[in-house]
C-alpha cells in the first residue's frame, strides 16, 4: 500500500519517513512567550534532527467557560506568526474555526488545522480545502477512524489532496478520552500521513468544572504508544509554567523536559521504522 507524502517547504511528511513534530503552545498567550517557546523547540529539534513546525492557536473558540482566555485574535495572531516565521525560519500551523478565516490564515500559515469538534462542518472543510494549503484534519472525539474517509473526500472534491489526519482520542463516557491504537492502522489505509496529538489525548474534558483537566504525568507513555504505530508525526504542546498556562496546562509537557522527551521518541521512531512489515491478514 503506497503511502502519500505531503510536502511543507523542505519538510517531507509521510508514515514511512522520520517523524515530524508539530509542536508549540496551546494558545498565543503573548508575543514574548510564543517567541520563548518557539526558540526552545527550534534549539531542541535542530540538535536532535527532527523536522519541526511551530504550533499555536490565535483563538480558542471552544473554551468551556465564556470567561476563559481565548487568545489575541486573527489580526494580532497573524502578526505574531509572521514574526516567528521570519525570526526562526520555521513553518507554522494554526487552527481555523470559521470559513471566513481560512484564506487570511492560509496566506500566513503553512498548515491550517481543522478542529476535531468542527471536522464534519462541510462549509468550513470546503473553505479550507479551497485555499490549497496543507490541512491537518483532527479526528473528532465522536467519530470512528473509518469515518474520516468522508472528510478526506470533501477536501479532495474541493480540489485539495494535501491532507494529514490526526488522532486526538475518543470520548469514553463523561470527562474522559481514550486512544484506540487500532485506529491508526485504519486511518493509514487511506494512504495519507497520520499524526498523533498526544497532548489533547490526555485531556479530561470539563474535568475542572469550568475548564479541561489533564494527565501530564502520562504524556511519555502515551506518546511512545502512539509512535510505535509507525506514524508520520507527533502533535505536542509544552509550556514553561503549565500550572499557570491560560489553556490546557494540565496536559502540557514542561518545556524544560522537551529535549529528554523528544530524544527518546526519536530513538523509538527510528527503531520502529527499521522493522520490515509483516503481513498478517
From Swiss-Prot:
Q: Which UniProt keywords apply?
A: Cytoplasm, Lipopolysaccharide biosynthesis, Transferase
The record's GO molecular-function terms, alphabetically, read: 3-deoxy-8-phosphooctulonate synthase activity
Which GO terms are recorded in the biological process aspect for this UniProt protein? carbon utilization; Kdo2-lipid A biosynthetic process; keto-3-deoxy-D-manno-octulosonic acid biosynthetic process; lipopolysaccharide biosynthetic process
Sorted alphabetically, which InterPro entries does this protein's record hold?
Answer: Aldolase_TIM, DAHP1/KDSA, KDO8P_synthase
EC top class, in one word?
transferase
Protein's pathway: Carbohydrate biosynthesis; 3-deoxy-D-manno-octulosonate biosynthesis; 3-deoxy-D-manno-octulosonate from D-ribulose 5-phosphate: step 2/3; Bacterial outer membrane biogenesis; lipopolysaccharide biosynthesis
Check the record and name the Pfam families matching this protein: DAHP_synth_1
Which reactions is this enzyme annotated as catalysing? Answer: D-arabinose 5-phosphate + phosphoenolpyruvate + H2O = 3-deoxy-alpha-D-manno-2-octulosonate-8-phosphate + phosphate
Enzyme Commission code: 2.5.1.55
Report the locations given in the UniProt record: Cytoplasm
Q: What's an example GO cellular component term for this entry?
A: Gram-negative-bacterium-type cell wall
For the keyword Cytoplasm, the answer is: yes
Q: Where are the transmembrane segments?
A: none
* PANTHER family in alphabetical order: PHOSPHO-2-DEHYDRO-3-DEOXYHEPTONATE ALDOLASE
Stated family: Belongs to the KdsA family.
The protein's name = 2-dehydro-3-deoxyphosphooctonate aldolase
Q: Which organism is it from?
A: Pseudomonas aeruginosa (strain ATCC 15692 / DSM 22644 / CIP 104116 / JCM 14847 / LMG 12228 / 1C / PRS 101 / PAO1)
